[in-house]
C-alpha cells in the first residue's frame, strides 16, 4: 500500500521535471538565437538566392526551421519581401509560418504531451481535449493576432496540450495572414524604397495590433467568467446528498 502511495508523487515529480526541462531548453534556445544573433540571416538570404528558381521553396523550408528555432518572425518575413517582393513574398512567408507551427507543435507534442495529460489527470485531460476539439482552431487564430507573444513558443505550448496538426496549420495560415503581409511588404518596401508600400504595411500592422489587443481582452474576460462559473458550481451543495445525510 505504501509503495503504491509513494509511486504517485514520484511519477508526478517526474512529469513536472520533464516539463520544466523542456521549458528551460526552449528558453535557453530563445536566448541563444533571438538575443545573441547567433544565426546570420543575411548569410541565409545569400544562400537561398544562390538556389535560383528553387529559392522560394528553399526559403519556405529554411525559414520554417529557423522560425522553430526562435529566429524572429518579422525578420524572416522582411527577408522574404526583400528576396521575392511583396506578392510572392507573402505566400512564401505564409508557407514558412505554417511550417514553423507544424514543426514546433510536433516537437511540443512529442516532448510534453504525455506529461501534461498526466499532470491534468484523466478527467480534466479529457475535458481539455474536448475543448481543444471545439475551440483549438480559433485559439491558434486568436493567438496570432495578439501582439508580443512568440508564435514559436505558442506553437510548442499548443503541441504540448495536443492541438491537432490541421488546426495548427489552418489557424497559423488564417491568423498570420495580416502580419505576414505587413512584415513582408515592409521588407519589400525597404528593398524597393517604396513609401506607399511601407505606409500600407504599417497601417495593416497597426490595425492587426488593435484587433489583437481587443481579442486578448475579450478572451481574458471570458476566461475569468468561466473560472468564476466553475467556482460557483463547485460551491453548490448537492440537495440529495444533504437529505441523505439527515
UniProtKB/Swiss-Prot annotation:
Species of origin: Mycobacterium tuberculosis (strain ATCC 25618 / H37Rv)
Membrane topology of the entry: Multi-pass membrane protein
Source species, domain of life: Bacteria
Record-stated family: Belongs to the TVP38/TMEM64 family.
Protein name: TVP38/TMEM64 family membrane protein Rv0625c
Modified residues (N-acetylserine): 2
PANTHER family (UniProt xref): GOLGI APPARATUS MEMBRANE PROTEIN TVP38-RELATED, TVP38_TMEM64 FAMILY MEMBRANE PROTEIN RV0625C
Residues passing through the membrane, by range: 19-39, 57-77, 83-103, 157-177, 196-216
InterPro entries found in the cross-reference section: TMEM64, VTT_dom
Main location: membrane
